[in-house]
Amino acid sequence: MIKTIDHIGIMTNDLQKSVEFYTDVLGFSISAKIEMEEVGLSAIFIEKNGSKIELMGYRGAIPKRSEGIEIIMGGSSIPLNDHITFTVDDLGATVSELKGKGIEFGLEPMQVEGGIKIAFFKDPNGVLMELMEHPKQQNKSTEYIIV
């Protein structure tokens, strides 16, 4: 039976640019490199605190990533699509640090149901990234309730 997610794979348009983004901007480290020349695929695994992402480069054409949909929440438009969510201790400090590294946020951080704070940005491939700060008193087994 399933125990846990091993890694998340992301097909990139520019493998080197993606590796630089995840290592230099988000602080991941390279943990493995795989070359499959016979099929035209290169993969670089990056890791941080046990979370792994496989960045893949392909010599053929990469289909355009879905634009997703947008929902209105708290008076702001929030993109809703396939995404990766990173837990942070201090959303404001993390957003400031990433803005200092040239990251643009589509909207300012906001607080949602249950006191959770969120913010969104995209990686160089258009993959939606979400930052999430849980309230200090809450444990990690938070249930999400859509109302």
Region spans (language model):
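Vicinal oxygen chelate
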Residues: 1, 44-45, 86, 92-147
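Active-site/binding-pocket entry motifs
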Residues: 52, 59-62, 137
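A short acidic-to-branched-hydrophobic micro-motif
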Residues: 54-55, 131
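Core segments of cupin and vicinal oxygen chelate
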Residues: 11-53
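Short, P/G- and charge-enriched loop/turn segments at secondary-structure junctions
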Residues: 69-75
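Eukaryotic phosphotyrosine signaling hubs
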Residues: 5-7, 79-83
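A short, polar/proline- and glycine-enriched secondary-structure boundary/capping micro-motif
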Residues: 64-69, 141-143
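Short hydrophobic/aromatic beta-strand micro-patches
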Residues: 9-11, 85-89
